[in-house]
Amino acid sequence: MPKMKTKKSASKRFTARPGGTIKRGQAFKRHILTKKTTKNKRHLRGTEGVHETNLKSVRAMMPYA
């Protein structure tokens, strides 16, 4: 049986943590930033974990992560 392929778009957006969770970047931080407050932009920095409702589908896209 051939090896499963990793979805390359998912591998660029998500990284697996040692504990089994998957981290992702924040949304709403690319453009139209002038109307957002400094506090709002500050809270959008960094990464978050993928929500448990989406975790199964993200893991299916990255079988070897």
UniProtKB/Swiss-Prot annotation:
Highest taxon, organism lineage: Bacteria
Residue ranges with Basic and acidic residues bias: 45-54
GO cellular component: cytosolic large ribosomal subunit
Biological process according to GO: translation
Alphabetized Pfam families for the sequence: Ribosomal_L35p
Protein name: Large ribosomal subunit protein bL35
InterPro entries cross-referenced by the UniProt entry: Ribosomal_bL35 (IPR001706), Ribosomal_bL35-like (IPR021137), Ribosomal_bL35_CS (IPR018265), Ribosomal_bL35_sf (IPR037229)
Species of the source: Ralstonia pickettii (strain 12J)
Gene Ontology molecular function: structural constituent of ribosome
Residue ranges, annotated region (Disordered): 1-26, 38-65
Keyword Ribonucleoprotein: yes
Gene: rpmI
Keyword vocabulary terms for this entry: Ribonucleoprotein, Ribosomal protein
Stretches with biased composition (Basic residues): 1-15
Family that this chain belongs to: Belongs to the bacterial ribosomal protein bL35 family.
